[in-house]
């Protein structure tokens, strides 16, 4: 933003938020005047130009990657990511139209493009920075709705509502930034090589409140409420899951007789509810919203760290001359605000595996893996297999691929993950009628996890007298280095009648493993 509040840095103005004094660029025997250009320090100009040029280039490339990541990946086209794209567009516009001229001003020490372009440039500066702040404000409201109303979020925040919110962001930003172009400013200096800031007191108050302090208050209130709601909801959902597990209403592995399965299914239809409780569904959806809130909380936190020093130094230096910081400190403060434009493209891939994969695919490093994931998403199920665990097997965990199953960006359908194949041992197939098995894999399961059926009643401590089923979750058979039976093993995919979510049922008997 253009520091329209600055009344203390006014001697020879670069058009950005801090004023640069001409005597900083003149020799010891030279004086600044309207007719004399400052002497250029070539060494300093080259070093400053290289540093600022690299910074601007990084901001441009990073924000382009953010925009392309959402545009080229259908599963990233969510309302929350629309706000992220809007933030990237504002930062990209700032990097293209404002930062190069700010860097030129730093290198040369005076404005070279005339009075009219100075006014336009300053207005675009305010426009882009205000749009960034208001986008973060919209993101904080979106995250509060996502955490507070996680199940109703898709109906409360639709694509149409998100687009209307983005249009409102740019309209408000235009209203705040256009004032000086319409004459709401003090008289311009006589020297066109000075690009001063607007010191008109009422516009200074209006722009500072609308561009930073009011949106900042909304952001802080929303994220405080997100923290309170997340803490309370997590506690309640975890308590509900523990209660249902203790009542044996929610089992991740159920082995039962065919008659019992049919009776349970018929009673479930009669009662009109699903034995798989909605508590797990709520917990899974809420965990996704909370994870997104954490990532965007980092974005907001870095924004505050970058811009707050400037908005503290600017009004204090304007109102109280004794509190005015040195020119070198003031330059660092306002360029720290500009530095925020290249931070977000670093935060997203570090905090989100989905954005990291999208960045890598755009850069051409994982195109083949991207095709595999897209094909699996079209099939609607993850190709994970299980095998019986036999006597003498060591209780080890194996990670068959680097991507953990808790990533919501791939191989996810609804609220459960499915295990589409079974591989019984040859010796077990000839045993005759065996109970069917029904498997429901939840996102918390990891490749290599060991799943065991509790001991049958009345046989506690007698592991050799009853069929103790133990299974090991293997990795994706399509992934390199993964082993597993990829045949369907007589399994069929069914649908959860209550929730409309894909489930999995297998009538293929599995081999018991004895320790």
Swiss-Prot record:
Motif Nuclear localization signal mapped to chain: 368-378
Mapped to this chain, the residue ranges on the Extracellular side of the membrane are 1-45, 106-115, 183-201, 320-326
Stretches assigned to the Cytoplasmic side: 71-83, 142-161, 225-295, 352-515
Q: Which UniProt keywords apply?
A: Cell membrane, Cytoplasm, Disulfide bond, G-protein coupled receptor, Glycoprotein, Lipoprotein, Membrane, Nucleus, Palmitate, Phosphoprotein, Receptor, Transducer, Transmembrane, Transmembrane helix
For bias type Polar residues, the affected ranges are: 410-424, 484-498
Output the InterPro entries linked to this UniProt entry.
ADR_fam, ADRA1B_rcpt, GPCR_Rhodpsn, GPCR_Rhodpsn_7TM
Q: What is its main location?
A: nucleus
Q: Give disulfide pairs as residue numbers.
A: 118-195
State the Gene Ontology terms under molecular function: alpha1-adrenergic receptor activity; protein heterodimerization activity
Membrane topology reported for the UniProt record = Multi-pass membrane protein
Region annotation (Disordered) ranges? 392-430, 474-515
| Listed SMART domains | 7TM_GPCR_Srsx
Q: Which residues cross the membrane?
A: 46-70, 84-105, 116-141, 162-182, 202-224, 296-319, 327-351
Q: What does this protein do, in the record's words?
A: This alpha-adrenergic receptor mediates its action by association with G proteins that activate a phosphatidylinositol-calcium second messenger system. Its effect is mediated by G(q) and G(11) proteins. Nuclear ADRA1A-ADRA1B heterooligomers regulate phenylephrine (PE)-stimulated ERK signaling in cardiac myocytes.
Name of the protein? Alpha-1B adrenergic receptor
Tell me the organism.
Rattus norvegicus
**What's the encoding gene here?**
Adra1b
